[in-house]
A protein has these predicted regions:
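C-terminal motif of bacterial Sec signal peptides marking the signal peptidase cleavage site
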Residues: 15-17
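Hydrophobic face of amphipathic alpha-helices that form TPR/SEL1-like repeat modules
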Residues: 59-66, 70, 95-102, 130-138, ...
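Short helix-capping/linker turns of helical repeat alpha-solenoids
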Residues: 50-53, 66-68, 86-89, 102-104, ...
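Bacterial signal peptide processing site
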Residues: 19-21
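Terminal, low-structured helical/coil segments at or just beyond the last alpha-helical repeat
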Residues: 202, 211-243
Length: 243
């Protein structure tokens, strides 16, 4: 009987071990497939970019900046973004601003960052205003001004940029206007993505603490769960502590 038990246990261990190996093999294979697809995409975009395709140049700049599916290369990001910016591509101008703002591959230069973001906004880039707002809110290279930050975030919000909407919500929360902050947080609607995650988490916080709304563990839990589905680890921690 004991012998049969030992054999059965060994079989289970073997099956479990094989399962883990197969999972690792599948994950490795998926990573290789994604990498190959991205390499093919970069090759195609590079061919177009070298022929003067401005959109291809801007997209290459963004891919190398974000490191999506490949290793980030800030030097190449700047190179391609500058080529596109020379031809009035406003997304490229914004990405140049990010490189200077964060000091990615270049020395931090808030003046150049602000100038690049301003150019992108002048051209109608929807995401550019959020960065001007962030710089104004935190006094990065410009005089710290919540009024200016609000102004820029409102431009972004009116262009449909949810990050600007979230930033506006946080500004109103700072001054105790919770009703207004909730209005902006709820612009996430039923989206489930990383942009919406902090908005759901913020709503969960307000309901958990009864700020601007009647305290409701049920509502807080629902918003934290949405935030978790959208990729927030912090919301997971808050949900565990929720009483």
């Amino acid at each position: 009987m004991k012998k049969k038990y030992i054999i059965a246990t060994l079989i289970l261990i073997l099956v479990f071990s094989c399962g883990k190996k197969n999972k690792r093999a599948r994950n490795s294979q998926n990573n290789v497939t994604l990498e190959n697809k991205m390499n093919d995409k970069i090759k195609e975009l590079t061919e177009k970019a070298n022929k003067g395709d401005v959109e291809a140049q801007a997209e290459l700049g963004e891919i190398y900046l974000q490191g999506d599916g490949i290793k980030a290369d800030y030097k190449k990001s700047m190179e391609w973004s500058k080529k596109a910016a020379e031809n009035k591509n406003y997304r490229a101008m914004r990405n140049i601003g990010i490189l200077y703002l964060e000091g990615l591959g270049v020395k931090k230069d808030y003046k150049k960052a602000f100038s690049s973001f301003s150019s992108s906004v002048d051209g109608g880039d929807a995401q550019g205003p959020r960065y001007l707002g962030i710089m104004s809110e935190n006094g990065l290279g410009v005089k710290k001004s919540l009024d200016d930050a609000e102004f820029y975030y409102e431009i972004g919000d009116s262009s449909g940029d949810l990050v600007s909407s979230y930033k506006l919500g946080k500004l109103y929360e700072k001054v105790g206007d919770y009703a207004k902050s909730i209005e902006f947080y709820k612009k996430a609607e039923d989206r489930i993505d990383k942009t919406a995650a902090p908005m759901y988490e913020a709503l969960g916080d307000l309901y958990a603490n009864g700020k601007g709304v009647e305290k409701s563990t049920k509502e807080a839990r629902e918003y934290y769960e949405k935030a978790i589905k959208s990729g927030s680890q912090e919301a997971q921690n808050k949900l565990v502590k929720l009483k």
